[in-house]
Regions:
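Extreme N-terminal, non-catalytic leader segments
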Residues: 1-17
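Hydrophobic anchor at the beta1->P-loop junction of P-loop NTPases
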Residues: 20
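The conserved Walker
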Residues: 24
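Hydrophobic positions on the alpha1 helix immediately C-terminal to the Walker A/P-loop
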Residues: 31
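Small-molecule kinase domains that catalyze NTP-dependent phosphoryl transfer to phosphate-bearing small molecules
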Residues: 90-91, 136-142, 150-159, 184-234
């Protein structure tokens, strides 16, 4: 992998890339892990980068709850993005990839609903997306990469041979999140979760830069009525028909 890759939308990749885009709660993370395990490829959780940036911005005393963000705050967040000291390390005990900011394990701190809302806000800043673009492309390494995000197939790896768009109804995603939190002993209102998901969808789909839309030629899967194993089977079947050599 060359470090000096072009940051244009006509990026020519040397290795194999599968992109999996879609809204929060559709099951992208689980699907990405399953596909990567099947192929023995690397994983990029691009959403984690934006969640980490949201945490870093709040640590720098930038109030992300005030909307719209001021130009000064946007500039400050962009500077943080350009100097973000992030690593992803494999936990040999759990098998999970854990995020580190400035050598400190963020653990589950970036997986809260608040972190997701913060990520959506910083991701709407065009200069932030530019700052993180090259960093995301640097994850592309042999033997291949499965990239999970919202603009992986439209912007970051727009020439990927396989593009997946995984979606589900807002109601279904709210129910899934509600059940996850209840199982963890966290009391929450499903109505509040649904409102939060709809607000994030609105922000992600209508931002001026890299809005959340299926990439041209993407294989669209609605997981609302499907189990994750059914989604996985559909995706592997699609890959096998379109690019069978990737499964060899």
């Amino acid at each position: 992998m060359e470090n000096g890759k072009s940051n244009t939308n006509n990026l020519i990749t040397n290795n194999k890339v599968i992109t999996i885009d879609g809204p929060s709660g559709a099951g992208k993370g689980t699907l990405t892990k399953l596909v990567a395990e099947k192929l023995g490829w690397h994983i990029l959780d691009s959403g984690a980068l934006y969640r980490i940036l949201g945490v870093a911005a709040e640590r720098a005393d930038i109030d992300l709850s005030i909307e719209p963000l001021s130009d000064k705050n946007k500039e400050s967040i962009t500077r943080i993005a350009r100097n973000l000291n992030v690593e992803f390390k494999l936990n040999s005990d759990s098998g999970e990839v854990e995020p580190y900011l400035d050598d400190k394990n963020l653990g589950k701190q970036i997986r809260t609903d608040q972190a997701g809302q913060s990520a959506s806000k910083v991701a709407a800043i065009p200069t932030v997306r530019d700052a993180l673009l090259a960093r995301q492309r640097d994850f592309e390494q042999a033997p291949g990469l499965v990239a999970d995000g919202r603009d992986m197939g439209t912007i970051v790896f727009n020439d990927a041979p396989i593009k997946i768009f995984l979606t589900a109804s807002a109601e279904c995603r709210a129910k899934r999140r509600y059940e996850q939190l209840i199982n963890k002993g966290v009391g929450v209102s499903i109505r509040a979760l649904l409102e939060s998901i709809k607000a994030r969808d609105e922000r992600d789909q209508n931002r001026p830069v890299a809005p959340l839309v299926p990439a041209d030629g993407a294989f669209v899967v609605d997981s609302s009525e499907l189990s994750i194993s059914q989604v996985f089977d559909q995706v592997i079947d699609y890959i096998g028909k379109k690019r069978p050599e990737l499964l060899q």
